[in-house]
């Protein structure tokens, strides 16, 4: 039956062509055909079995026509170069609701007094009529997918920038002015990317991101594409990427800057406390470096010493040479741990070591010199001088505060009766009779004149002169009779009571 079936199948194969069984028999007998070609005899030629397979003719790679040029252009191909990169840090990405108050992307050579812009140059443009340039934003890292943030400003629409250049003398240059970066919210990321892809804005044909990938919203790159057209041909220049541009408001990518330091010098042994005011930093991602050309050291501080991301309290590291004899100037930097970015350096001076920081030796030397100078003094320790000091008495306030001013002589007061006479004591007899009848005034009028001789001169300082004593005595006297004062009361040589 099997043979009859095979005969029947052979008959059908002649009528309908090769069957699946014939193909399997051909595959299984391939080894036998190689070892002994005469073993297998096919009723039909292999060409009849594979007659339905079409094989294209091989064309060498050198003979393939170019898809960029039609026809081929003589000379080197055009090239796009970035003559000035955009400034990487210092620009803040703005939302659409914030407007365009932040300015534009500056060039890397820009300074406070001289503003520059990103610039491109296209060379080998001989014979080209115009060049169409498209600028878009892509990821920082490969595969450089389209970024959801967009460009805004002059010649910008739908998040991209388009300009048309006319080359002159085989070269085309262009500076991008008033070009800003507009960021999107997280809920708008998907729609922004889909809009770019619909416009066929995908320089590296990377498509949309995968589910496990995450978009970095704090950093972008500018991607420049150029399409050159001429008489009867067109050429697309490969895309060129700029340096990364970081968002200023993000502490993970922002520019590092030291605003102020409370000390600009310190001991070479280190360990001194220094306060640094800076822009916002991440306390777990920041270092403070003291260094010069061939030496660097880290300052000592912890995360708790970073106050509100804008102040750092640290201790200075020791200088590598503790035996310096002259001040050594170094620089102080802020350094981010993740990307190694550093701030501009601030000067700091290490001072030589002080041999006697507490001044013990200088004090001892001064004391020794003073003792040597007092060897010939009869009272080297000042004991007798202390004994001669007099206690302050009640008359100390009589000493004039300004010794250069001399008091007037008492003779001038003797001729002016108003200075030592009572207002009611006048030659009027009625007034005198009135005073004598009063017991209080009668005792005063009959009392003996007051003299300073009744007071011991030990209560008077040596500085009180005769004029002052005469003035006091005249003030105490209540009579109009002038009482002379003895000279011996103020003479240290003789009279003592």
From Swiss-Prot:
Pfam families from the xrefs? Answer: RHD_dimer, RHD_DNA_bind
Q: Name one GO cellular component term.
A: cytoplasm
Q: Where is this motif: Nuclear localization signal?
A: 386-391
The name this protein carries in UniProt is Transcription factor RelB homolog
Function according to Swiss-Prot or TrEMBL: Does not bind DNA by itself; probably associates with a p50-NF-kappa-B homolog to act as an activator. Could be involved in hematopoiesis and spleen development. May play a role in the regulation of the circadian clock.
Gene Ontology biological process terms from the UniProt entry: canonical NF-kappaB signal transduction; cellular response to stress; inflammatory response; innate immune response; non-canonical NF-kappaB signal transduction; positive regulation of transcription by RNA polymerase II; response to cytokine; rhythmic process
User: What are the residue boundaries of the RHD domain, all occurrences included?
Assistant: 78-393
Name the domain of life this protein comes from.
Eukaryota
**Keyword Nucleus carried by entry:** yes
Q: Gene name on record? A: relb
Taxonomy, top ranks, is: Eukaryota, Metazoa, Chordata, Craniata, Vertebrata
- Which InterPro entries would you find in this protein's record? Ig-like_fold (IPR013783), Ig_E-set (IPR014756), IPT_dom (IPR002909), IPT_NFkappaB (IPR033926), NFkB/Dor (IPR000451), p53-like_TF_DNA-bd_sf (IPR008967), RelB_RHD_N (IPR030496), RHD_CS (IPR030492)
Q: Which organism is it from?
A: Xenopus laevis
Q: Which UniProt keywords apply?
A: Activator, Biological rhythms, Nucleus, Transcription, Transcription regulation
Query: Where does this polypeptide localize?
Result: Nucleus
Spell out the molecular function terms from Gene Ontology: DNA-binding transcription factor activity, RNA polymerase II-specific; RNA polymerase II cis-regulatory region sequence-specific DNA binding
Q: Which stretches does the entry tag as region Disordered?
A: 359-383
- Keyword presence, Transferase: no
């Amino acid at each position: 039956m099997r043979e009859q079936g095979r005969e029947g199948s052979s008959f059908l194969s002649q009528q309908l062509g090769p069957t699946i069984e014939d193909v399997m028999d051909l595959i299984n007998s391939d080894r036998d055909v190689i070892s002994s070609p005469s073993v297998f005899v096919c009723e039909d030629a292999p060409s009849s079995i594979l007659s339905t397979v079409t094989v294209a003719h091989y064309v060498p790679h050198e003979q393939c026509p170019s898809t960029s040029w039609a026809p081929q252009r003589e000379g080197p191909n055009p090239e796009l170069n970035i003559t000035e990169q955009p400034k990487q840090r210092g620009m803040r990405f703005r939302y659409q609701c914030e407007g365009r108050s932040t300015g534009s992307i500056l060039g890397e050579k820009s300074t406070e007094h001289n503003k520059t812009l990103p610039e491109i140059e296209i060379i080998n443009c001989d014979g080209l009529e115009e060049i169409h340039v498209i600028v878009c934003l892509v990821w920082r890292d490969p595969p450089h997918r389209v970024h959801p943030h967009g460009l805004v400003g002059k010649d910008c629409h739908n998040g991209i920038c388009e300009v048309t250049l006319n080359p002159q003398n085989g070269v085309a240059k262009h500076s991008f002015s008033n070009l800003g970066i507009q960021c999107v919210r997280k809920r708008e990321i998907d729609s922004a990317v889909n809009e770019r892809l619909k416009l066929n804005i995908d320089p590296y044909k990377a498509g949309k991101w995968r589910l496990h990938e995450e978009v970095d919203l704090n950093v972008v790159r500018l991607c420049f594409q150029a399409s050159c057209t001429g008489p009867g041909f067109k050429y697309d220049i490969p895309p060129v990427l700029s340096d990364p541009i970081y968002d200023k408001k993000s502490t993970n990518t922002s520019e590092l800057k030291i605003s102020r330091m409370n000390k600009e010098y310190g001991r070479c042994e280190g360990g001194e406390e220094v306060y640094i005011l800076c822009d916002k930093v991440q306390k777990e991602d920041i270092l403070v470096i003291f260094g010069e050309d061939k030496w660097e050291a880290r300052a000592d501080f912890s995360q708790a010493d970073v106050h509100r991301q804008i102040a750092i309290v640290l201790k200075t590291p020791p200088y590598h040479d503790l035996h310096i004899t002259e001040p050594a100037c170094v620089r102080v930097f802020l350094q981010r741990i993740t990307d190694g970015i550093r701030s501009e350096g601030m000067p700091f001076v290490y001072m030589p070591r002080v041999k006697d920081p507490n001044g013990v030796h200088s004090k001892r030397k001064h004391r020794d010199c003073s003792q040597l100078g007092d060897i010939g003094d009869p009272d080297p320790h000042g004991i007798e001088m202390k004994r001669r000091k007099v206690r302050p008495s009640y008359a100390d306030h009589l000493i004039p505060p300004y010794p250069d001013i001399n008091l007037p002589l008492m003779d001038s007061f003797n001729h002016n009766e108003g200075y030592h006479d009572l207002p009611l004591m006048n030659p009027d007899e009625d007034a005198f009779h009135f005073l004598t009848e009063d017991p209080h005034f009668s005792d005063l009028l009959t009392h003996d004149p007051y003299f300073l001789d009744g007071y011991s001169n030990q209560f008077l300082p040596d500085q009180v002169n005769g004029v002052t004593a005469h003035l006091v005595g005249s003030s105490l006297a209540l009579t109009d009779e002038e009482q002379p004062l003895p000279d011996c009361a103020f003479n240290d040589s003789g009279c003592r009571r």
